[in-house]
Design a protein with these regions (language model features):
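Short, structured loop/turn "capping" segments at alpha-beta junctions
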Residues: 77, 116, 127, 142-146, ...
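A conserved alpha-helical element in kinase catalytic cores
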Residues: 1-73, 77
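Active-site activation/catalytic loop segments of kinase-like enzymes and analogous catalytic loops
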Residues: 132-168, 184-195
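Conserved kinase catalytic-core helix
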Residues: 49-84, 95-100, 105, 109-110, ...
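Eukaryotic Ser/Thr/Pro-rich intrinsically disordered, low-complexity regulatory regions
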Residues: 177-179
């Protein structure tokens, strides 16, 4: 596949994860200025329509546990000597290299459990709380009920609480994740709209599809900010 602009940083991170014994990410087999070859991770990426076995509370907890293992392995990686892609807001950066794109399509499942993260192109200095906020937005999901058409409908706050408490974050970390939800939403969709405006057709098509639900999700998160913080306790 084509290499991303900050591929050297990404490859160093993946090599570190492998050396640390983390088996939940691909390994680099070959790389050049234009293309890279990574190992194939057997399983099924959680692409829409999401399979029923990825919608269970057990699957939700497995995503949180996968992130927890990733953050533990990444904690000893020093990002200082590399250039990284788009930075996250400074108030949510701790120095840990977070994945920053914990979209369902970037998580590989096997037998109803999350077993690997893929697509580290947006990875960069961030925090565990930032990743947890991002993952929870997608996996709770933190959306208006009219945009949830599966068994998760009506359970966003309950599932958010489950995810936070399975993430391994301290109480302060969980509160930080709750505080990061709207900022993470804005950061994510700024990338989409900027890429669409720059003429990338795939992003333009995606934005036309999600603009309405994204706006409703942001309003939902703002309206429920106190509830999100309460779930962190």
């Amino acid at each position: 596949r084509p290499t991303a602009p900050c591929w050297q940083a990404t490859h160093a991170l993946l090599a570190h994860l492998s050396a640390a014994g983390f088996d939940g990410a691909p390994r680099v087999l070959a790389a050049g200025q234009a293309t890279e070859t990574l190992t194939y991770v057997p399983g099924r990426a959680a692409v829409p329509p999401l399979p029923e076995d990825t919608l269970t509370d057990a699957a939700l907890v497995s995503v949180a546990e996968l992130l927890r293992r990733y953050h533990s392995a990444a904690a000893s990686f020093d990002p200082a000597r590399f250039q990284w892609p788009r930075p996250i807001p400074a108030r949510f950066r701790t120095g840990l290299v977070s994945h920053n794109d914990v979209h369902p399509a970037n998580i590989v499942f096997r037998d109803g459990r999350a077993i690997a993260l893929i697509d580290f192109d947006l990875a960069g200095p961030g925090s565990a709380a930032w990743d947890v906020a991002a993952a929870a937005r997608y996996w709770a999901p933190l959306q208006d009920d009219q945009d949830i058409a599966d068994s998760r409908q009506g359970r966003a706050l309950e599932r958010f609480r489950i995810f936070l408490h399975a993430s391994g974050l301290s109480q302060a970390g969980r509160r930080r994740a709750a505080e990061a939800v709207v900022a993470n939403h804005d950061w994510t969709y700024a990338i989409v709209t900027e890429m669409a405006a720059a003429g990338h057709q795939g992003f333009a098509d995606h934005w036309r599809e999600v603009a309405g639900p994204a706006a409703r999700a942001r309003r939902w998160c703002q309206r429920h900010q106190r509830d999100l913080l309460a779930a962190a306790e």
